[in-house]
From Swiss-Prot:
It comes from Medicago truncatula. This is Casparian strip membrane protein 4. It is a multi-pass membrane protein. Regulates membrane-cell wall junctions and localized cell wall deposition. Required for establishment of the Casparian strip membrane domain (CSD) and the subsequent formation of Casparian strips, a cell wall modification of the root endodermis that determines an apoplastic barrier between the intraorganismal apoplasm and the extraorganismal apoplasm and prevents lateral diffusion. It comes from the Eukaryota. The chain crosses the membrane at residues 61-81, 109-129, 142-162, 195-215.
Length: 220
């Protein structure tokens, strides 16, 4: 009887060991199944800086395009106003009817302000290109925000003062006994109005530049 029990125990021992090895193999396969999610999380964490840099590069390209638009509008406003004059075909022995932009101090300030804004915007183009090449750099973008804010204030002030003169030229002022001159100097008034509109367009471009650069700085 003892020999039979020893034979049965010896025969069942390999079966138990095989079951244990199978269970261990299943455990290893379960651990192996958990490894791909860890690898996926590592890939996602590495991809986030690339997505962030791509977004900033797109913002930098938009900044460059808006900067070109602001240069065109400000330079156009300065050129139109700086070449604006009209001489009426009739004159008397002592008087000639002539209207020119430098007869008004506000128009002089307008030409200087828009010309300076166009010049500084041209000088800022290399910094905008640096932001495209290095989208994560915060120093050049912070400098552009400061310059754009100053230029926006300058252009808005110049456009507002010139708009007041253009309004008086079109409508006059009964209280001050100022007559409207745009009925006689039609071309001069049209040129002045077009320059003022271009200057306000430049100020809108500059405002968009400030917003775009501020958003890019906030995401750094």
């Amino acid at each position: 009887m003892d020999s039979r029990r020893e034979v049965e125990e010896s025969s069942t021992a390999p079966i138990l060991e095989s079951k244990r090895t199978r269970s261990n193999g299943k455990g290893k396969s379960i651990d192996g199944d958990h490894s791909p999610p860890h690898a996926a999380t590592v890939v996602t964490t590495k991809a986030t800086p690339l997505q962030k840099g791509g977004m900033k590069k797109g913002i930098a390209i938009l900044d460059f395009i808006l900067r070109l638009g602001a240069i065109g509008a400000a330079l156009g406003a300065a050129v139109i106003m700086g070449t604006n004059e009209q001489i009426l075909p009739f004159f008397t022995q002592f008087l000639q009817f002539h209207a020119q932009w430098d007869d008004f101090p506000m128009f002089k300030f307008f030409v200087v302000a828009n010309g300076a804004a166009a010049g500084f915007l041209i000088l800022s183009l290399p910094f905008s290109i640096v932001c495209i090449v290095r989208p994560l750099a915060a120093g050049p973008r912070f400098l552009l925000v400061i310059v754009d804010l100053v230029l926006m204030a300058l252009v808005v002030a110049a456009a507002s003062s010139a708009a007041a003169v253009v309004y008086l030229a079109h409508n006059g002022s009964q209280d001050a006994n100022w007559n409207a001159i745009c009925q006689q100097f039609t071309d001069f008034c049209q040129g002045s109005s077009l320059a003022v509109v271009a200057s306000f367009v430049a100020s809108v471009f500059l405002a968009c530049l400030v917003v775009v650069s501020s958003v890019a700085l906030k995401r750094t």
